[in-house]
Amino acid sequence: MCAQVWLLTDRLIREDYPQVQILRALRQRCSEQDVGFRAVFLDQIAVTVVGGHLGLQLSQKPLTTFPDVVVVRVSTPSVQSDSEITILRHLEKLGCRLVNRPQSILNCINKFWTFQELAGHGVPMPDTFSYGGHEDFSKMIDEAEPLGYPVVVKSTRGHRGKAVFLARDKHHLSDICHLVRHDVPYLFQKYVKESHGKDIRVVVVGGQVIGSMLRCSTDGRMQSNCFLGGVGVKCPLTEQGKQLAIQVSNILGMDFCGIDLLIMDDGSFTVCEANANVGFLAFDQACNLDVGAIIADYAMSLLPNRQTGKMAILPGLASPREKNEPNGCVSAQGVAESVYAITNGSTSSESEPELGEARDSSVKTMGAPPAHVAQAWLQH
């Protein structure tokens, strides 16, 4: 029986750069290796229990065989346990190997849930408070007093650096109360001053660090996200930083992810966030990588009678030039040098006004013309 691979995503994000790149790479590899391939939208699937047995319908047609591996790309800020996660759990119970698994995605869709999972494992994290009720933000102002000021305030379901505030003092925090959405809880987090406006994005695939990027704010704001106008540059990471990112990925059970590390004065790191549906346009550009292809190779390695994912992706991760580069430490001096490089042309930006153009340019370079993207999703 022919092995099958699916790429499963939301129709609304199908034309985003990561989905296009993974689609291209999976289709190519499945064609070359005589493996069945489908690109599937979540809204095409119906899950069934008939006669006490699990079943699956695709576009209203019952399936008699199921995919061996499913690469999942869902918009984590909007993921709901009674909709998207229900479908993912069903596929997993049918014996499909999901990349990432539903529990791993759940571990990351709420920022406080991530910290709950990491707690007790010796992972360095900023002290963090949160609450249960959606209307309890104002009640937490006094509770969060031990964190000191300024204090970081984040939506537990925020993404791309949105819904993040830095409250200068208690009065400022009270003012923020009138600005926040009250449909999700917020968290209050100790401010890491030395990492203001900068962090390290580390991408992990199959339990291995494939690259790291220094992200820097260009307007003085605390968030360094490229989506908000920050810029990124390839940045070597210490062994301690790599092991921390891998540890976080393993604890959360993720096959591929982005780990954001804050930089301490002594060169050590503390974990800021983990992303199960990591974007990688700016990362590909800064690090000269094709993360979509690496994810596809890892997914193919999980098919029956294949090598383990770890063995399969080791040989091609670094180019000869990258292999000869020193594995330098991200220190205060290293950060300063990287920022200087950023401001002198070695930049990658994912700010909103340029995102569409950057995405289209990159997709053309990688071999998937944007005009044909929608049609590509219809070719099963």
Curated annotation (Swiss-Prot):
Residues that hold Mg(2+) 2 according to the record:
E273, N275
Residue numbers carrying Phosphoserine: S319
Q: Which GO terms describe its cellular component?
A: cytoplasm
Enzyme class, broadest EC rank: ligase
Q: Which GO terms describe its molecular function?
A: ATP binding; metal ion binding; N-acetyl-L-aspartate-L-glutamate ligase activity
Q: Which cofactor does it need?
A: Mg(2+); Mn(2+)
Q: Name one GO biological process term.
A: protein modification process
Further comment found in the protein's record: N-acetyl-L-aspartyl-L-glutamate (NAAG) is the most abundant dipeptide present in vertebrate central nervous system (CNS).
Protein family membership: Belongs to the RimK family.
**Name of this chain's protein:** N-acetylaspartylglutamate synthase A
- Origin species, per record, is Mus musculus (Mouse)
The taxonomy runs: Eukaryota, Metazoa, Chordata, Craniata, Vertebrata
